[in-house]
Amino acid sequence: MTRREIRNCAFILIYEKLLRDDPIEELYETADEIEEITVNDSVKILVESVLEKAEELDGKISNYSTTRSITRIPKINLAILRIAFYEILYDDLTPVNVAINEAVLLLSLIHI
């Protein structure tokens, strides 16, 4: 799986978690059942890392969001922002410009 595919699968799961506060293991099982999302160790690591740091990431996002509070940011956008901020702050393997570019690309794909 490419890093982009991992990120896309993680995005869907993080977004689902924002919509439904189900246990993450249940979301993994559902994803496996419908076979639309690949849930491998790489996806799980990214999802769980982002969810573990969600409160801290939201604080950082809030610092840069001068016009909207974190609760007013659409959940679909928040999921993408959390992944991007996580990669920028904690993922040494992803250069900052790549994390930003991937977030913009993902936003453009979902906001067609």
Residue ranges and their predicted role:
Residues 1-30:
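Long, amphipathic alpha-helical "stalk/connector" segments that mediate intersubunit docking
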Residues 23-28, 58-63, 102:
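Amphipathic alpha-helical scaffolding segments comprising HEAT/armadillo-like alpha-solenoid repeats
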Residues 30-31, 106:
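Alpha-solenoid HEAT/Armadillo-like helical repeat scaffolds in large eukaryotic proteins
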